[in-house]
Amino acid sequence: MPYWKELLKGDPLPWLLEPDTVQPAIRYFTLRDILGHDNSNSEVKKAQAAIMSSGPVPVMLAAQQPEGYWNKPGPGYGPKYQGTIWSVIFLAQLGADGANPQVHTSCEYVLSHSIANNGGFSANGTPSAVIHCMAGNLGSALIDLGWSGDKRLQAALEWQARTITGEGIADSQNKDSVERYYKSGTTGPLFACSANAGLSCAWGAVKAMLALGKIPLSKRSPRIQSAIQQGTDFLLSRDPAVADYPFGPGSRINSSWFKFGYPIGYVTDVLQNLEVLVALRQAQHTRLTHKVNQCFKAGFEQAKL
């Protein structure tokens, strides 16, 4: 029996593997991420086919325009949770098949319309709207949907890494430089963000690490490795179970860390923080074992978390 099963009150796998026409992705991710089957496995193929024919994914694709966008043409951030950027992010989180023609068209659309002239993913196509939470979400989604070899995506991820480390990026006062921070969006290194009063934003850090952490070790540039290390150190600088990261003026903790839902947008919860840090090989860190144990204690009679 795997070690993690011994910590639960029961075996959740039969429940997780149940066919579910409302949320078919649960079975798919269980087969792939918990049981370790790759995409060539016949059951994994069937599970992903179910995603494409039932649940939310076909509903989303039915609303897509032939050109590849949702709602209106352009960069695609708005309307929030319904625009093109959000649709691509959620398609990936829901396990959509990147080889599907409509999904492929949507990815090409955002890569053609949502990148600023500095190379970063932008909410409105301008450098001042490059922001870590959106850029990380979108980068992660595009990797999941099979675009890791695309030069535009690679450049966007390199730019995100640079904005984390600050390498060669001028401050917001240097308006003659294309490669600079802005008073809006990403305002400085180490995830500084205007939406968080210019402080380092842990939500942005989690999303950035979600994307950069999916780059294979052999493909990571020294800059990306440095950004991942800085992001990991920042997320572990506080107890992830408490989530007392910098949050605007004052010292209160953002309650959204403890409100769970899926798919997940620009907000981050403690479970996604845990997911990212485990993926970055920090599972044995003392601050993570606290949170892991807390999650296991949350299991109830049927071993459902």
Language model: regions and residue ranges:
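Preference for long, amphipathic alpha-helical scaffolds in soluble/luminal domains
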Residues: 1-305
